[in-house]
From Swiss-Prot:
Organism: Biomphalaria glabrata
Keywords annotated in UniProt: Acetylation, ATP-binding, Cytoplasm, Cytoskeleton, Hydrolase, Methylation, Nucleotide-binding, Oxidation
Residue numbers carrying N6-methyllysine: K85
Family matches, as InterPro entries: Actin, Actin/actin-like_CS, Actin_CS, ATPase_NBD
Name recorded for this polypeptide: Actin, cytoplasmic
Length: 376
């Protein structure tokens, strides 16, 4: 890129939300749900200008007449036609830019299949005619955003949770762990345990309400059994929440029972290990000489790590698993909900990064497989 004054675009496509904006900014300009909706019925009114598909917030607000689909499942793109619609919406409606004028930095899940990165590359160059692009691993960007190049990132979003050890800027694929338990599952679980209290939440509209309850009132207990004890003997942990129709509901031990599932997936009927064990197992898969650096640089990232109390609990749990004298530090940056995007913004604006872009010319010469040679 000889043209230094053109800002690169940074697009972080998550299972739940898409974050997009310009490199060099400190926060994404656009954050919208990663959903594509199609009308359930043929329009009755002629000339209503009904579109064949809606994306993001517009799809969310018209969900009564649409069938909603999430093109990204568990962090990995499964529907390319819909994904293309999301990117189109990102460039033209949210950021209002011409993608053929800006380099684009995209993010991918750890252990993303090779064919997927090639497909992303192909769509960017052939459909959107970008002058240059790059694909970066989400967890690596979160680590950059925290000002580190070595550490282990526990990234938990809406669709998937990963623990990714990174040494000197490179992810160590053999030690990456994936846990299919994240924000969406926690919302489902909260819906379930609120139903036990006698409140009924079933529809997609109600699911959004429960997600809001989760984000506003849930927290992680330092000692779960102790907290359950406290909740059963006093009402000090109870909070009330006003529903959109004005009805007020009370929520007690559900506040910490919901996020506890990330430490005890058995609550959801899953046999997987909790996030603390997963992080520990990831570290143990790494070379013995770098473990010390990973324990001392454990970085939390993603929306599902936003629960109050999560860092203290991680500290406690990992200390119990690790060797007795090991220094353990859990880093939970306040902006961790967007740290993947922020890391991308930092990376794409570094002068040393400018020769890393895959240019249109390189793509034309080598085809989509160029992505494996230039992005790792």
């Amino acid at each position: 890129m000889c043209d230094e004054d053109v800002a690169a675009l940074v697009v972080d496509n998550g299972s739940g939300m898409c974050k997009a904006g310009f490199a060099g900014d400190d926060a994404p300009r656009a954050v919208f749900p990663s959903i594509v909706g199609r009308p359930r019925h043929q329009g009755v009114m002629v000339g209503m200008g009904q579109k064949d598909s809606y994306v993001g917030d517009e799809a969310q607000s018209k969900r009564g007449i649409l069938t909603l689909k999430y093109p990204i499942e568990h962090g990995i793109v499964t529907n390319w036609d819909d994904m293309e619609k999301i990117w189109h919406h990102t460039f033209y409606n949210e950021l209002r830019v011409a993608p053929e004028e800006h380099p684009v930095l995209l993010t991918e899940a750890p252990l993303n299949p090779k064919a997927n990165r090639e497909k992303m590359t192909q769509i960017m160059f052939e459909t959107f005619n970008t002058p240059a692009m790059y694909v970066a691993i989400q967890a690596v960007l979160s680590l950059y955003a925290s000002g580190r190049t070595t550490g282990i990132v526990m990234d938990s979003g809406d669709g998937v949770t990963h623990t990714v050890p990174i040494y000197e800027g490179y992810a160590l694929p053999h030690a990456i762990m994936r846990l299919d338990l994240a924000g969406r599952d926690l919302t489902d679980y909260l819906m379930k345990i609120l139903t036990e209290r006698g409140y009924s939440f079933t529809t997609t509209a109600e699911r959004e309400i429960v997600r809001d309850i989760k984000e506003k009132l849930c927290y992680v207990a330092l000692d779960f059994e102790q907290e359950m004890q406290t909740a059963s003997t006093s009402s000090s942990l109870e909070k009330s929440y006003e529903l959109p129709d004005g009805q007020v509901i009370t929520i007690g031990n559900e506040r910490f029972r919901c996020p506890e599932a990330t430490f005890q997936p058995s609550f959801l009927g899953m046999e997987a290990a909790g996030i603390h064990e997963t992080t520990y197992n990831s570290i143990m898969k790494c070379d013995v000489d770098i473990r010390k650096d990973l324990y001392a640089n454990t970085v939390l990232s993603g929306g599902s790590t936003m629960f109050p109390g999560i860092a203290d609990r991680m500290q406690k749990e990992i200390t119990a698993l690790a060797p007795p004298t090991m220094k353990i530090k859990i880093i939970a940056p306040p902006e961790r909900k967007y740290s993947v995007w922020i890391g991308g913004s930092i990376l794409a604006s570094l002068s040393t990064f400018q020769q890393m872009w895959i240019s249109k010319q390189e793509y034309d010469e080598s085809g989509p497989s160029i992505v494996h040679r230039k992005c790792f």
